Amino acid sequence: MSAMRLFALTSAMLPLAFILSTSPFPATAAEKNVIVEQRNASSSPKQRLDQLFSQLKRERDPDKASSIANEIRLEWNDSGSATINLLMQWADKAIEEKRNPAALDFLDEAIALKPDYAESWNRRATLNFVMGNYRKSMSDIEHVLNIEPRHFGALSGMAAILSNSGNDQLTLKAWERFLDIYPADRTAQEQVNMLAEKLAGNRT
């Protein structure tokens, strides 16, 4: 699992496939072209995201919901600033080459230039987790959720950290928040059911 994949977990925790599916990856050139073509010139990024999240909340088919989630990720990956986008690309490359200190520098700069861009915080949260800096990772996640409370990728990261700490009750709450945004995700459903049963068993 590369550093860009959101929050590596042990086999007893989240399946790798789910972490990959909830991580917001950098968009390819082709994907960015699709975004541009699909965007309505009269709609703002916030309006597009609001519409996509509304669709995601209503959709019950997992495959269709996954497609909507991918559109949301693509929107998240565009900061609206060429400078920030370039810094994020440099950070991604540094992470891929395992130059984590350089990646942190790029992400720190992106955050300093545009502190309201959630994805730079989220990317740094991922890197901090991979580097074992769990408190810093959770702090970054909280910043992400302050900016974009519907960030299901950050919520899955929060659940991963809480699960690692052994706090099943708070892990369950994180997954319930996730499902309130993205109800069709099967793995999140399984996590909620598993944790609910485990906690119920502990009470008996």
Curated annotation (Swiss-Prot):
Residues 1-29 form the signal peptide. InterPro entries: TPR-like_helical_dom_sf, TPR_rpt. Gene3D superfamilies: Tetratricopeptide repeat domain. Keywords: Repeat, Signal, TPR repeat. SMART domains: TPR. TPR repeats lie at residues 84-117, 118-151, 153-185. This is TPR repeat-containing protein RHE_CH03534.1.
